[in-house]
Amino acid sequence: MNYSLEFFPPKDQESFKDFIDQARLLSIFSPEYMSITHTADTVDNNQTMEAVKILKKNLSVEIKPHMTCINYSKSEIMEMAQNYLSLGVDSIVALRGNTKQSVSNREPYYDNSLDFIKALNAGFDIRVSISGYPEAHPESRGVIADFIHLKEKSDAGVDEIITQWCFSNDLILRYRDLCYARDIKIPISPGILPISDIKKVKYFAKLCGSTIPVEIEKAFLNIEGNDDAAEDLGVQFAIQQIDDLLNEGIDNFHLYTLNRGDMTRKIIEHFEAPNRIKTVSSEMKAS
């Protein structure tokens, strides 16, 4: 079993210590990499890059930033990529992202992830991961169109598909089989989200077009108000989901940590002890 871990960058300096503590807690399990979601107002005010800097400085785990292209000019996004390479990053998650501004009267920009991926591979010696959607992208034009686009991105030079979190293994396995049927042979890492707050997960599921199986929702509603029981149940569901996918031949997983190392740690410990305990300084500075 191989796994990667996803974090989001802290919103302020006060949150950095806990962020670092959670990353350090999980680094002893030797994940394939830690990815950091994209949060940046401008090229110069990039919280993701600050998080990458501190983790690269203090951990011997591969750090993989997410990059979204639609809110930056072509020159800005290429500058950002170069800045990451200067930090020793050699792999990124390339995404289109959601627009935050009017697209009129702007410098030329990449309005889709395919062109962005092509530009990254043409300009840099870099490995690229992309997103996948077992339940279809919210802006899906249909299954055929989605997989034509995915095949184009695969052929443009991609090393991995990280899926949106999905609680249905049937949908994940169907997605894998559809990829293979269309000669998309790059590794697929299903996204696994341990649930602790069912109301928050329902809210985000609505935004991204994901579904929550009725039996899972009912199980959490039956213990509403008991946070400890909810966390235990979330861990149990995640373990069962991974177990079932392992039995179907899938052995790469992307764990959405939500910056909470405790639940993720319990899931990993179910499958393996730490592969290698690293020596990490206890005095990690957010600078």
Question: What do these predicted regions represent?
Answer:
Residues Q13-L26, T48, K74-Q82, R141-E152, ...:
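Short, acidic/polar
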Residues F16-R24, T42-V61:
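Glycine-rich, positively charged N-terminal anion/phosphate-binding segment
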Residues F7-P10, T37-D41, H66-Y72, G97-T99, ...:
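Active-site beta-loop-alpha junctions enriched in small/polar residues
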Residues E14, P108, N112-Y133, D183-V235, ...:
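Active-site pocket-lining/capping segments in soluble small-molecule metabolic enzymes
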Residues S30-A51, G97-P108, V158-I172, T257-G261:
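Glycine-rich, proline-tolerant flexible connector loops at the mouths of alpha/beta enzymes
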Residues C69-N83, E107-D111:
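Glycine-rich anion/phosphate-binding loops
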Residues N2-D18, I63-S75, S129-A145, N222-Q236:
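Active-site mouth loops of central-metabolism enzymes
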Residues E6, M34, Y84, K153, ...:
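Conserved, mostly hydrophobic/aromatic
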